[in-house]
Amino acid sequence: MKTGARESGFSLIEALVAGVILSVGLLGLAYAYGQGTASVVVSQQMAIARQKAREAVEDVMTARNTATLTWDQINNVSNGGVFIDGTESLLNPGPDGIVNTVDDGTSAVSPCLTGADCIVVPGDDGLLSDGTPEPLSNYTRKIAITSINSELKQITVTITYTTLRGLQRSYSMTCYVSPYV
């Protein structure tokens, strides 16, 4: 038997230190994964807000271009127009086809079976044909119309929404419209 032979291998302390380092690394990776997932959700909510703001501006422009509304009607209700003053939940655009007017939410538009506006979430196969409608109940819209002069109006659409973390976020779009097509 040899005496004084040196043992090789890991000691218990070395194994514990390696375990702690590995645990800290894995916790950091899990945190980064969670933050990445949260960013995807936040960017999806921002994309919806941006699209709903564009939709409102397009409704105003289309109403002007097709003479659905007169130039004087392209105003908030307080100024003799048809667009609701203040903030309103996102609702289906009613019979006139224009958002943020008095008749919003009075008719069900496919695929939204209620008065609330919705988006279709893809089904299990990733296609919209078997998707389910998801109401946009955490979004609100405000259309503010300001007359710059008799031939020019400023339209500001603000979409406000609540994130999954409970934070209020908003997206605003401003454009100018004249009575000329």
Identify the role of each PLM range:
Residues M1-F10:
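N-terminal leader/signal peptides at the extreme start of proteins
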Residues F10-R54, A67:
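Aliphatic-rich helix starts adjacent to a transmembrane/signal segment
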Residues A47, Q51-V181:
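Low-complexity, Gly/Pro-rich coil/beta segments used as flexible assembly/activation regions
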